[in-house]
């Protein structure tokens, strides 16, 4: 299973880098539940310096508030794993990066920490590109923590590829 994910990462991330180079676009990430894996996958490819601008791991609520200026009231009312928080993360990332494409990721990797309303495997992926901004919600069930992170990273890559093409 690890080899399959590795192959997917390398193939899809290389496709993404080539597409971004071709279109002369830069990308930045604000990660929470993926813990820097997204940025790591991109920068493990040769040529990534031409397209990768910024990678932030804002794992704690405090980091989200301090670095990405996510309002305390958003986290208190909706939680760090919410559409509202993800939207705030991607919007504010776009203000501090030098990128055309900005992506935010927040979720519950597990194996603990989930609730009935927000189960383990829940993830929100925010994307801002040109005038478009959206947040997608996914639920990846019955996955280990690392597999959840890998599936999330692959979903981000596929999402960016589909939006930029």
What is each of the regions a protein language model found here?
Residues 4-165:
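Short alpha-helical segments enriched in small residues
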């Amino acid at each position: 299973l690890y080899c399959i994910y590795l192959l997917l990462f390398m193939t899809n991330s290389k496709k993404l880098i080539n597409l971004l180079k071709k279109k002369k676009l830069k990308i930045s990430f604000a990660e929470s539940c993926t813990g820097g894996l997204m940025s790591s996958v991109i920068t493990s490819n040769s040529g990534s310096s031409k397209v990768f601008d910024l990678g932030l791991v804002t794992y704690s609520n405090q980091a989200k508030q301090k670095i990405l200026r996510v309002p305390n009231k958003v986290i208190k009312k909706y939680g760090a794993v919410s559409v509202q928080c993800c939207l705030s993360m991607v919007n504010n990332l776009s203000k501090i990066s030098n990128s055309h494409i900005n992506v935010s990721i927040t979720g519950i990797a597990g194996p603990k920490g989930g609730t009935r309303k927000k189960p383990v495997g829940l993830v929100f992926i925010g994307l801002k590109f040109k005038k478009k901004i959206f947040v997608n919600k996914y639920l990846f069930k019955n996955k280990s923590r690392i597999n959840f992170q890998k599936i999330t990273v692959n979903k981000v890559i596929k999402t960016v590829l589909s939006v930029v093409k």
